[in-house]
From Swiss-Prot:
This is Probable parvulin-type peptidyl-prolyl cis-trans isomerase. PROSITE patterns: PPIC_PPIASE_1 (PS01096), PPIC_PPIASE_2 (PS50198). One of its GO terms (molecular function) is peptidyl-prolyl cis-trans isomerase activity. It comes from Bordetella bronchiseptica (strain ATCC BAA-588 / NCTC 13252 / RB50). It holds the Pfam family Rotamase_3.
C-alpha cells in the first residue's frame, strides 16, 4: 500500500470531462481512464494486474482525493513551502518525461555499443592485473620487523598477516587482496605493485595514508577483457547517460542564461 501511495503522489493525469467515473469524492470524479493509467504505472513497477489490485488502487485514489480536498479547504495547498514542493515535483516529472522521450527518439544503436566496446578494449590492451597480498601496520618499525621475517621465510607471510595486519578485510585471508589492476590501489601502493614481478616482495615498507604496508605480488596476468554481450547493459546505460549529457549541454547553449 505504501508503494502505491507514493506512486499516487507523483501521478498527475489529465482526463476528459466525459470519461466514465469509477468514484466521486464530494463531486470530484475519479475516472476509469485515470484508474487504468495508474494501474498501468503500478504494473510497470512489477505488480500483476488483477481485480484486487484495481480495487486497492481505487481506494488509494479515493484516499488521496480526500486528503487533497482537505488540504485545499484548510489552505495548506497555498502555503509557500508546499507550492515550492509542488513546483519541484512538477519539474521533476517533466524532466523525466522529456528525457524518456528524447531517449526514445535517439536510441543507443548497436554500432555505438560496438564502437564504445572496441574503444575501451583498446584502452585496456596490454594492461596487467596483480594478485597481491599485504600486511598493514601503523608504524615503520613494525613494518620493517615483519618484512625481515617474511624475507627470511616467505611462508610466514600468511600467519604474520593474520596476526598483525590492521586491514580487517584481508587479514583473515593472510593478507590476500585478490586479483585487481594496480589502478585499484592508492599511490604509492600501486606504484610499488607495478614494479614487482611474480613472487617478489618489496625491498622496504610502503607508506600510504592508511599506514605502512609490507607488499608481495603472488602472480600477474594480462587483463582479460569481457565479451561484448557481458558488458552490453553497462555500455548501453553509459551511452544513454552520454546522450542525455550532450542533450543537456545543447539545451544550455541554446538557452539565455544570465
Amino acid at each position: 500500500m505504501k508503494r502505491i501511495a507514493m506512486l499516487a503522489a507523483a501521478c498527475v493525469i489529465a482526463v476528459p470531462a466525459f470519461a466514465q467515473n469509477v468514484a466521486t469524492v464530494n463531486g470530484k470524479p475519479i475516472t476509469q481512464k485515470s484508474l487504468d493509467e495508474f494501474v498501468k504505472l503500478v504494473v510497470s513497477q512489477g505488480a500483476t494486474d488483477s481485480p484486487q489490485l484495481r480495487e486497492q488502487i481505487k481506494q488509494e485514489m479515493i484516499n488521496r482525493q480526500v486528503f487533497v480536498q482537505a488540504a485545499e479547504k484548510d489552505g495548506v495547498a497555498k502555503q509557500a513551502d508546499v507550492q515550492t514542493e509542488i513546483e519541484l515535483a512538477r519539474q521533476g516529472i517533466l524532466v523525466r518525461a522529456l528525457m524518456a522521450d528524447y531517449l526514445q527518439k535517439h536510441p543507443v544503436t548497436d554500432a555505438q555499443v560496438k564502437a564504445e566496446y572496441e574503444k575501451i578494449k583498446k584502452e585496456q590492451a596490454g594492461k596487467m592485473e596483480y594478485k597481491v597480498r599485504h600486511i598493514l601496520v601503523e608504524d615503520e618499525k613494525t613494518a620493517n620487523d615483519l618484512l625481515a621475517q617474511v624475507k627470511s621465510n616467505k611462508s610466514k607471510f600468511d600467519d604474520l598477516a593474520k596476526k598483525n595486519s590492521k586491514d580487517p578485510g584481508s587479514a583473515e585471508r593472510g593478507g590476500d587482496l585478490g586479483w585487481a589492476p594496480a589502478t585499484n590501489y592508492v599511490q604509492p601502493f600501486a606504484e610499488a605493485v607495478t614494479k614487482l614481478k611474480k613472487g617478489q616482495l618489496v625491498d622496504k615498507p610502503v607508506q600510504t595514508q592508511f599506514g605502512w604496508h609490507v607488499i608481495q605480488v603472488d602472480d600477474t596476468r594480462p587483463v582479460e577483457f569481457p565479451a561484448m554481450d557481458q558488458v552490453r547493459p553497462q555500455l548501453e546505460e553509459m551511452l544513454r547517460q552520454q546522450t542525455l549529457a550532450n542533450y543537456q549541454k545543447q539545451l544550455r547553449e541554446q538557452a539565455k542564461i544570465q
